């Protein structure tokens, strides 16, 4: 149980945005593609994502982790916001998150969110941030699996997997910054595949909490996701 303190810890968002988004088949990384309409504003995916975070009163700052050759971020209007800073990322997502954590005080909590996940609902974020007062470990947003799940070998079904306890891991994921840094460093040193931040804590023996989140908190990965994200953004207005 979290020890009560006189003041709540700072919440600092870390957005790994150093990927090139090759599956989008575009001339720029997916986070710099423009989506929206007159209601939502015509902005890049990254700007929509940052807006969703900074709209919440508990989020103090956003650390955007960009690639060394990023030619786009500093052309955005949002880049001049004093609550936003950038650091240079690494080869893999975990390396980039570690780089972002270098700009986060150890006493703060790190809210790690996909740069290309712009449809975050404020009520989901509020419920996730509430675990700061309840936990020493942290937790993640996740959506329960609804489809029938199959395990296969060589393209043929082996068996149906029981789905009752299966979840789609989403972001944001929220952890004490010092703990997340320690777990990421250990997992990387041991050669463990870190597919999300929670997996690093799991490797180190911790059990992050699951907060049920909305399934429309999608990550834009393929060209067909653009229209869907734009639709969901409109519904948030």
Swiss-Prot record:
Coiled coil: none annotated. Pfam families: IspD (PF01128). Pathway: Isoprenoid biosynthesis; isopentenyl diphosphate biosynthesis via DXP pathway; isopentenyl diphosphate from 1-deoxy-D-xylulose 5-phosphate: step 2/6. The record marks 23, 30 as: Transition state stabilizer. Its EC number is 2.7.7.60. GO terms for biological process: isopentenyl diphosphate biosynthetic process, methylerythritol 4-phosphate pathway. The keyword Transferase applies. Homodimer. Catalyzes the formation of 4-diphosphocytidyl-2-C-methyl-D-erythritol from CTP and 2-C-methyl-D-erythritol 4-phosphate (MEP). This is 2-C-methyl-D-erythritol 4-phosphate cytidylyltransferase. The lineage of its organism: Bacteria, Pseudomonadati, Pseudomonadota, Gammaproteobacteria, Enterobacterales.
């Amino acid at each position: 149980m979290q020890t009560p303190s006189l003041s709540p810890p700072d919440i600092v968002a870390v957005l790994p945005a150093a990927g090139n988004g090759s599956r989008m088949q575009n001339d720029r990384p997916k986070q710099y593609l423009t989506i929206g309409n007159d209601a939502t504003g015509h902005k890049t995916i990254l700007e929509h994502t940052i807006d969703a975070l900074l709209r919440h009163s508990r989020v103090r700052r956003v650390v955007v982790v960009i690639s060394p050759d990023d030619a786009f971020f500093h052309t955005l209007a949002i880049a001049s916001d004093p609550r936003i800073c950038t650091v240079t990322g690494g080869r893999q997502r975990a390396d980039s998150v570690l780089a972002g954590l270098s700009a986060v005080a150890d006493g703060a909590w790190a809210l790690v969110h996909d740069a290309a996940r712009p449809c975050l609902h404020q009520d989901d974020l509020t419920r996730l941030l509430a675990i700061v007062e309840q936990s020493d470990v942290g937790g993640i947003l996740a959506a329960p699996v609804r489809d029938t799940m199959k395990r296969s070998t060589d393209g043929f079904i082996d068996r149906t997997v029981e789905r009752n306890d299966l979840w789609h891991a989403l972001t944001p994921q929220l952890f004490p910054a010092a703990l997340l840094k320690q777990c990421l460093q250990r997992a990387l040193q041991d050669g463990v595949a870190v597919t999300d931040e929670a997996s690093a804590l799991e490797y180190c023996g911790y059990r992050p909490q699951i907060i049920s989140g909305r399934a429309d908190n999608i990550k834009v990965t393929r060209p067909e996701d653009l229209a869907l994200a734009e639709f969901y953004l409109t519904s948030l207005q």
